[in-house]
Amino acid sequence: MDDNKSKALTAAVGQIEKQFGKGAIMRLGDNQAMDIEAISTGSLTIDIALGIGGLPCGRVVEIYGPESSGKTTLTLQVIAEAQKNGKTCAFVDAEHALDPVYAEKLGVNIDELLVSQPDTGEQALEICDMLVRSGAVDVVIVDSVAALTPKAEIEGDMGDSHVGLQARLMSQALRKLTANIKRSNTLCIFINQIRMKIGVMFGNPETTTGGNALKFYSSVRLDIRRIGAVKEGDEVVGNETRVKVVKNKVAPPFKQAEFMIRYGEGISKEAELIDLGVKQKLVDKAGAWYSYKGDRIGQGKANVMKYLKEHPETANEIETKIRQELLLSKTVKAEEALPQGEDDVLPE
């Protein structure tokens, strides 16, 4: 750059900083926060699929799926992991269906968790914005977008038509929220439900509620599905669950994670460790027997899970080795992250 242009640029940058404050404009390489801090999801396979070891702080995340697929369970596990690291979490319960007993079973410290049960969608999003702007809350969960009912709809009569009200509400709220979320480095998770588009002959008829704004503003979108039942004898004790990373702006997208959710316990970390341990050749499998470092640790997956529960030091050792092999670090450099368009969708 020639001297005249350089002087003009320096003067312009100086004027911008004087008017709008230091940090209003900077060179990308000058930014200290090049590393993206991540909060673990409580599932090792999802952390690996996300590429940075968890959900990114300072970003909007959308988790959607059919009913009883494990959306709320996954977000409660995120809260439990965040609280273990001394972070403050808030749960905006628009569905009025949060079960504190179940949350406690998943490891959530309910005495420290902030909970709000708002009356209207506007109130819910205003509370969310105020918590984010405070800078004191690290994780905010909104459960769910479908339950964010606009005030006009609540005050109107049953059967009144309110076309696009919720979509407009979400669009306006996200325009306000995103800058504050980035500034305060808060992880904001929106849980969403699935609806069917009428008259779709070809392609996927499924869509999420609340319009398209959330799809664009989200840095990570997770599609969670129940793919089978976990049985002990004739009794169903849990779900086999699959998560697809439909959109990821901080690492390569379209990865999948499969794990087990046990009723009353949440995501089974031991089952993940066994599957990933065998895959990475850290755990040896011969027939039904599993061995670690030459020592037999159990016959059959159920017995090995029991062994790992009773020997947490072995479980932690296996987890550390898996993370070292599959995640180079818990954060990813911004320049290493794969760029992805905002309107990229999972191919059919």
UniProtKB/Swiss-Prot annotation:
Subcellular location per the Swiss-Prot or TrEMBL entry: Cytoplasm
Record family assignment: Belongs to the RecA family.
Organism whose genome encodes this protein: Alteromonas mediterranea (strain DSM 17117 / CIP 110805 / LMG 28347 / Deep ecotype)
Keyword Oxidoreductase attached: no
Pfam families xref list: RecA, RecA_C
Chief location of this protein within or outside the cell: cytoplasm
Gene encoding the protein: recA
Role this protein plays: Can catalyze the hydrolysis of ATP in the presence of single-stranded DNA, the ATP-dependent uptake of single-stranded DNA by duplex DNA, and the ATP-dependent hybridization of homologous single-stranded DNAs. It interacts with LexA causing its activation and leading to its autocatalytic cleavage.
GO cellular component annotations of the record: cytosol
Record key words, sorted: ATP-binding, Cytoplasm, DNA damage, DNA recombination, DNA repair, DNA-binding, Nucleotide-binding, SOS response
An MF annotation (GO) of this entry: damaged DNA binding
Entry protein name: Protein RecA
GO biological process: DNA recombination; DNA repair; SOS response
Residues that bind ATP: 65-72
